[in-house]
Amino acid sequence: MLLRRVVEGGRAVAAAVRGSGARRFSSPDCCQRLPGGGSFLQRHHPGAQAPDGRRKFGTDHVEVGSQAGADGTRPPKASLPPELQPPTNCCMSGCPNCVWVEYADRLLQHFQDGGERALAALEEHVADENLKAFLRMEIRLHTRCGG
């Protein structure tokens, strides 16, 4: 019964739109014309170039906000040894051997205090809140299970 009313209502709206002379937005004649004969879709900006989606060989992918100080606005409060720097080459696909999980393991092995200083380093050096929550869980899991 409800479905029938919804379908009938949809037909009524479609008929009203057809009768009012409304245009479809997907038609090419509705594009706004610009001076010089072009449209918004065809306008060329000589100073702007779109990236082709490829990176140079040997460069790491850095997620925006994945590392404190990545934008250059604030440096980390305390520097970590080079082997404990946060990774910059995560593929963000959720793989089981994630570089962030390895990073959490290295923090635990380095500090060996039950995870307190590892959690503090995590809070200080990782900017992404979702990633922090995941790594907090990993560190707590490792400290509880002894893993």
Curated annotation (Swiss-Prot):
Membrane-crossing residue ranges in chain numbering: none
One family name in Pfam for this protein: Oxidored-like
Disordered as annotated region, ranges: 36-82
Database matches in InterPro entries: Oxidoreductase-like_N, OXLD1
All copies of domain Oxidoreductase-like, residue ranges: 81-108
One Gene Ontology cellular component: mitochondrion
Top-level taxon: Eukaryota
Record's compositionally biased regions (Basic and acidic residues): 52-63
Name of the protein in question: Oxidoreductase-like domain-containing protein 1
Originating species: Homo sapiens (Human)
Upper classification of the organism: Eukaryota, Metazoa, Chordata, Craniata, Vertebrata
Gene name of this polypeptide: OXLD1
